[in-house]
């Protein structure tokens, strides 16, 4: 299509058209005319579009290539791994916020850790220099100050006691650091003491600029949802979990509709799956409502081994649960894992949506992320 200086359509009509087009096709309009190109770079439009498509989640898989999988449409796309990750042996942690992915990467040569923010859709990467060093046992949060949507911040919780097991239990107070993209610097939060810990296998979730994790008290058994508000830079307990979680059980947290949480629980004994959802997180009191309770011989085992990816899932716009599943192959000498995406309906019907191939458990020579849910966006990587 020939390019033009200006479109014959009014800008509000162009915006309305763009808001109905999937993000994968939007960038094609960059070549149409300068007016359309400018719209796709306009901050107001970028966030308006993102909010409209919050329910258009995808799974991202990084093996020898980057795969974006849309389980609702049964579609997938692929692209090369960014050159910035050439010396990365492994991406061990991801946190998603507004289409941006915070990645903790292990350096292939030095075996040390680095931190990057990456927009897979725009193929942009920014490395974040540490205040001191990054640890294998850091926990991270990613959000923004609600005063301004694009003022992004990172949270780092460094627990030296976990890093070095020879330390005397309880002798080290976890260090809290905040990185502000606006000032391009880290700072330590001095007056925060933590008497709780984040559940290590579970992925944290960023919702409307705040961070949420499954956590537990250090000196008693209760499990709860812990949040961090990036505007006030404070921690807050949101609510307790609506069930008891045993050692063999699996629990996974996800965002829902852009303003609430959902929580998946699979019993390690019966394999029954239940999903709970909250009311709006902005409400004064946040509580759980059971969304679905499924008992079926067709249910997959979501977390069969500690070496496999912790479950990732989301609830689509048709109220189906899309779950990333990994199953070890039955061959004794085979180190591969079969990867698929399953759909669980509210009626308990289980259906495999996509066979995503295999992954090698023993491979340690490439970045690898298997099944992380995120929303593609036009949000630029903060400078």
Swiss-Prot record:
SMART domains the UniProt entry points to: FBOX
Transmembrane segments: none
Segments forming domain F-box: 3-50
Domain of life: Eukaryota
Any Pfam family: FBA_1
Protein name stated in the entry: Putative F-box protein At3g22650
